[in-house]
């Protein structure tokens, strides 16, 4: 691909509908990969519930609608594996979506991601847009958040293992590495980037 347009969070607030529309109006955008989102670990999701649903809905609404309005040829929306029911069978299958109760701790985030998926589906049905969704597994990569309270499962595990290694007492029992019962696959960030280009 040539002429790739990217904006950091500091350069463009995707929650601001006027700024997002200006980006689309001033650039002929053919393909959009919507990977932007407010994300965090279980503690952040459960503590800042309103922020997670509001910010993610705003980002998705602005990008998806302007992609339609300005004739984007293809939009790829990256959802989240948390949209599937809390007690869903493993491995996860597409047909499990909306067939059970969501995990309470990240329910607002999951609902926002489900709304993004349904927006893409609805714009495809009503307007014939080539808007598709993929639900990647848990990701990690460069510049990930390794905070013990706000990160996702794998970065938190890496941080805990590092801390354990640094302990002079060599007491591994003091470090809890709990994946929980609903273990979900984990994929390095590069893998999803490479795979998404081929969808």
Role assignments for model-derived ranges:
Residues 15, 81-84, 139-141:
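Conserved sequence/active-site signature of Rossmann-fold short-chain dehydrogenase/reductase
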Residues 87-96, 118-199:
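NAD(P)-dependent short-chain dehydrogenase/reductase
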Residues 7, 32-38, 75-81, 134-136:
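SDR active-site strand-loop-helix element
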Residues 108, 112:
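Active-site helix of classical SDR
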Residues 61-106, 132:
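Conserved Rossmann-fold NAD(P)-dependent oxidoreductase catalytic core, especially the SDR/UDP-sugar
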Residues 2-22:
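Adenosine-cofactor binding site in Rossmann-like domains, unifying the SAM/SAH pocket
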């Amino acid at each position: 691909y040539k002429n790739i347009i990217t904006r950091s969070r500091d350069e463009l607030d995707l929650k601001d509908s006027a700024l997002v529309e200006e980006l689309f109006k001033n650039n002929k955008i053919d393909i959009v990969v919507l990977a932007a989102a407010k994300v965090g670990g279980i503690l952040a999701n459960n503590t800042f519930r309103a922020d997670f649903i509001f910010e993610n809905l705003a980002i998705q609404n602005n990008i998806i609608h302007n992609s339609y309005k300005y004739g984007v040829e293809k939009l790829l929306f990256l959802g989240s594996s948390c949209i599937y029911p809390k007690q869903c069978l493993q491995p996860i299958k597409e047909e499990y979506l909306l067939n059970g109760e969501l995990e309470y701790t990240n329910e607002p985030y999951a609902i926002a991601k489900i709304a993004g998926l349904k927006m893409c589906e609805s714009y495809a049905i009503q307007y014939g847009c080539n808007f598709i969704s993929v639900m990647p597994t848990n990701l990690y990569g460069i510049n990930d958040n390794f905070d013990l309270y706000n990160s996702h499962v794998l970065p938190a595990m890496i941080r805990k293992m590092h801390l354990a290694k640094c302990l002079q007492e060599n007491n591994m029992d003091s470090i809890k590495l709990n994946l929980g019962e609903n273990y979900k696959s984990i994929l390095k960030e590069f893998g999803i980037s490479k795979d998404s280009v081929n969808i």
